Amino acid sequence: CQLPNIILLCCQIVSNTAIDMQKLLSLPPNLVSAFYELENVDRTEWFCTSDPVGMKLGSGGGTTWLLREWQKERDRKYLAEERIPTEKCIPTEKSLPAEKRILLHAGGQSRRLPGYAPSGKILTPIPVFRWARGQKLGQNLLSLQLPLYEKIMERAPERLRTLIASGDVYIRAEKPLQEIPDADVVCYGLWVDPLLATHHGVFISDRNQPESLDFMLQKPSLEELENLSKTHLFLMDIGIWLLSDRAVDLLMKRSQKADGALDVDTPYSDLKYYDLYADFGLSLGNHPRIEDEELNSLSVAILPLPGGEFYHYGTSRELLSST
């Protein structure tokens, strides 16, 4: 924002008020206003919103919307603290804040899990695990998810400031995390049965360079995986993606319409449907499936999650089997 005699760098909050790790959640519309009270969380560390009603943005466009709404809220709070009238503020181009952030996409309508549609899958209550430490009687999917994501971000190189994950999975790591490479994009995967991999995204790596992504596929057939297995290895995408600021900037850029026209009364008018996995992901790797010079140039590393376990809460059947 810009004012006479004042240059305000939006979203660059004074360092002594900065939070080390922000949690940004995309939730069902009816849960947004009640979330802070239900979970008893600090609004300076947590932010939640919902995708625009009636607008399908995809996981890529949804990430852009979530980050923009978060920045807008930070700006609003800053202006209020400084007692600067918002109507005098002229929007300017701004970069992402410096602290690390965890983004959870949990705004689905739960059509396949209707019992938890009102609260969203993210607050699904999970029974205490037998013989496990750190369990709580009131635990839910969110409280079980978060510790692993926080550990990953604590180990991540400084420029990997954004972690994006799904709100309808529970992922466990039974072994210590390995060192995280300093790449533009780092994704975690699991060695799984080929049949299971056909229902998810799959990272394909050359057998001579297993840590480097050759290309990504979405829900490949068994025949495809069988043919590739002679020369390649594959890991199932478990939905934990770390992005550098450069990668986030490009993701946000690709989520916008070509003309970039923004209607002040419709803040999402410049956005389009863009999927993090099927669009952005297929543009990554040494031999990407989608040609895009800027995205193709991003460095990518693939890590198997040590002792990893993957539980999906997408349907009522999966709720029972995963629990």
Per-region residue spans from a language model:
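Unchanged
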Residues: L3-T323
